[in-house]
Amino acid sequence: QLEDRGMSLNGVVLLSSIMNYGVRQPGYPQNFVTLLPTYSATAWYHRKLAHPAATVGEQVQRARDFALGPYASALAKGHMISDAERAEIVRQMSELTGLSPTFIDNANMRVELSSFRKELLRDRRQTIGRLDTRYLGLDDDASGDSPEDDPSSSAVTGAYFGVFRDYVANELNYKTDVEYRM
């Protein structure tokens, strides 16, 4: 049907699955609320919690309840939050994420994913993966703000690339002599 309308397919463009870049804008707390359970599961997996739940599912539920309740409410208050409430939110976040209260407070209770990936295992001089937080990496600069690389991406890129090339060639019947680089 595209050719009937004067358009020919001349390649494949893969885009990120993110549907709303607006959630990443300053002042919009939803991204932090939805990431907190993942942070908690990651801290549970890497044994960084002082009082972990018995299972990762229970840990995630604890974090989800906190994130959707007290944490979301605290972020919505912005600078109007009381010092006492802020201190309590920071304390609970620390218990759920394994991050220090000072780090969380300095981040204004809004811990970016790259910062979390660098900070959680900083004491071991390790970083965690972005796509799969079970993967570990080592940075040359342990004092940096964010990881130098994504160990989870490095681990799966070869397999992903092979499957992608097979899919494009055999399912989409796209043939080319041009080298595809990732």
Residue ranges of predicted features:
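A catalytic-pocket lid/entrance helix-loop region that shapes and gates access to the active site
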Residues: 2-101
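Alpha/beta-hydrolase fold catalytic core
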Residues: 78-182
